C-alpha cells in the first residue's frame, strides 16, 4: 500500500511502514512539510496514496469535495502515541481495511477500536 504521512505524525512512521514493505513517504520528504491540507490532499490523490494523520481536517475536505479518493487514516488517541505505536496499530489492522482503503474510505484507528466510512461522505 502507498502512504503519505502528514506533518503531525512522526516521519519515523513512514520509515516503519516502508520497512514493512509498504511504499510510505513523509510530507517533509516530498517538499510538503508546510503545505496547506488542500495541497497534501491533491498530492496524495495524484500518487494514489493513503494519508495518515492526526488531523481531522482531511475528513472535512474530503466531505466538502465529495471525493472518493484519496483514502485517509485518522489516528486518534487520548494518550500520546509513539511512532512505533502508530505504525504497530496500522500494521496490525491494515489487512482488515485494505479493501476499504483501496476503494476510498476514511478509517479511524484508535486503541481498541476501528471505524470505516466509505467515500464519498455526505
Where are these regions (language model features)?
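N-terminal beta1-alpha1 ligand-phosphate binding loop
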Residues: 2-11
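Basic nucleic-acid-binding interfaces
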Residues: 10-12, 24-47, 64-66, 79-81, ...
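Short helix-loop-beta junction
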Residues: 16-24
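Acidic, metal-binding active-site segment of PIN/NYN-like and related structure-specific nucleases
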Residues: 45-62
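Mid-chain, well-packed structural core segment of small domains
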Residues: 59-93
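Charged phosphate-binding loop/patch that engages nucleotide di/tri-phosphates or the phosphate backbone
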Residues: 95-122
Amino acid at each position: 500500500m502507498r502512504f503519505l504521512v502528514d506533518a503531525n505524525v512522526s516521519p519515523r512512521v513512514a520509515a516503519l511502514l516502508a520497512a514493512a514493505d509498504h511504499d510510505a513517504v513523509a510530507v517533509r520528504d516530498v517538499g510538503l512539510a508546510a503545505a496547506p491540507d488542500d495541497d497534501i490532499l491533491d498530492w496524495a490523490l495524484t500518487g494514489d496514496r493513503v494519508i495518515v494523520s492526526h488531523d481531522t481536517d482531511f475528513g472535512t475536505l474530503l466531505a466538502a469535495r465529495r471525493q472518493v479518493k484519496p483514502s485517509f487514516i485518522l489516528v486518534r488517541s487520548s494518550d500520546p502515541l509513539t511512532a512505533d505505536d502508530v505504525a504497530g496499530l496500522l500494521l496490525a489492522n491494515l489487512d482488515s481495511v485494505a479493501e476499504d482503503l483501496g476503494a476510498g474510505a476514511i478509517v479511524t484507528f484508535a486503541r481498541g477500536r476501528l471505524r470505516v466510512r466509505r467515500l464519498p461522505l455526505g
